[in-house]
C-alpha cells in the first residue's frame, strides 16, 4: 500500500500543470506566487515532529520523495517558461534536506511511536544520507538554462551535525553544508 501511495504521489507531479495562478486573478500580481514561481518540490513529509508544526499531521511523518527523472522533467519545463531567467528559487520540501531519508528497517518505523525521528536524538535506524539530494542538486545545476538554484526551504541542521557510523554519510553531510554556504 505504501508503494502505491508513493507511486501516486510521484505521478501527481507529472500531470500537465500550468504553473500559473488561478484564472480568477486575471493578471494581478500575487507576491506569494512570485516567491514560489520557479521552485520545485522534491518531497513531502517531515519526521521532525515539532510540537508547533502541522506538516507531519497533513503530509505524514514518512518522507515520500520524487524520482530524479520527475524532478529534472519539471526543471526542464521551468527553463522553457518565457519569463524564466535561469534562477530556481527553491529545490526543497517541508525540510529541504530530508529528501530520500527513511528508516533502514521499515518494520521498525511502522512500529515506532516516537513523534520525531531526530529529537531528542537521531534514531539509529534513520538513514541520514545526503548523497541522493546532492546528486539532484548537481544534475539540476548541470541543465542548460540553469544559472543557479537555491534552497529556500528550511534546513534541519541537526541532520547536518549528526555523526553517523558511516564515514561516507558524514562526508556527504559536510559536502551538503558546503553546498548551502
Where in the sequence are the language-model features?
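Amphipathic alpha-helical segments in well-structured domains
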Residues: 68-72, 130-133
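N-terminal pre-triad scaffold of radical SAM enzymes
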Residues: 27-54, 72, 84-87, 181
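Flexible loop/turn segments at secondary-structure boundaries
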Residues: 5, 19, 47-49, 59-62, ...
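Conserved SAM/AdoMet-binding glycine-rich loop
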Residues: 77-181
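Flexible, acidic/Gly-rich N-terminal and inter-domain linker regions that tether
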Residues: 1-36
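Short, well-ordered alpha-helical packing segments
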Residues: 13, 47, 54, 72-79, ...
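Short, flexible loop/turn elements at secondary-structure junctions
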Residues: 16, 42-46, 54, 92-95, ...
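Iron-sulfur (Fe-S) cluster-binding segments and ferredoxin-like electron-carrier domains
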Residues: 53-70
Amino acid at each position: 500500500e505504501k508503494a502505491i501511495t508513493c507511486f501516486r504521489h510521484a505521478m501527481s507531479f507529472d500531470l500537465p500543470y500550468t504553473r500559473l495562478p488561478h484564472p480568477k486573478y486575471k493578471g494581478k500580481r500575487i507576491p506569494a506566487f512570485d516567491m514560489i514561481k520557479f521552485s520545485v518540490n522534491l518531497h513531502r513529509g517531515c519526521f521532525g515532529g515539532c510540537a508547533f508544526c502541522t506538516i507531519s499531521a497533513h503530509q505524514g511523518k514518512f518522507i515520500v520523495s520524487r524520482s530524479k527523472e520527475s524532478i529534472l522533467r519539471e526543471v526542464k519545463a521551468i527553463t522553457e517558461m518565457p519569463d524564466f531567467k535561469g534562477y530556481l528559487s527553491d529545490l526543497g520540501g517541508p525540510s529541504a534536506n530530508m529528501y530520500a531519508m527513511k528508516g533502514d528497517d521499515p518494520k521498525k518505523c511502522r512500529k515506532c511511536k516516537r513523534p520525531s525521528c531526530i529529537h531528542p536524538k537521531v534514531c539509529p535506524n534513520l538513514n541520514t544520507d545526503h548523497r541522493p539530494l546532492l546528486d539532484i542538486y548537481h544534475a539540476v545545476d548541470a541543465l542548460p538554462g540553469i544559472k543557479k538554484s537555491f534552497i529556500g526551504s528550511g534546513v534541519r541542521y541537526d541532520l547536518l551535525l549528526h555523526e553517523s557510523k558511516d564515514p561516507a554519510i558524514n562526508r556527504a553531510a559536510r559536502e551538503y553544508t558546503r553546498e548551502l554556504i
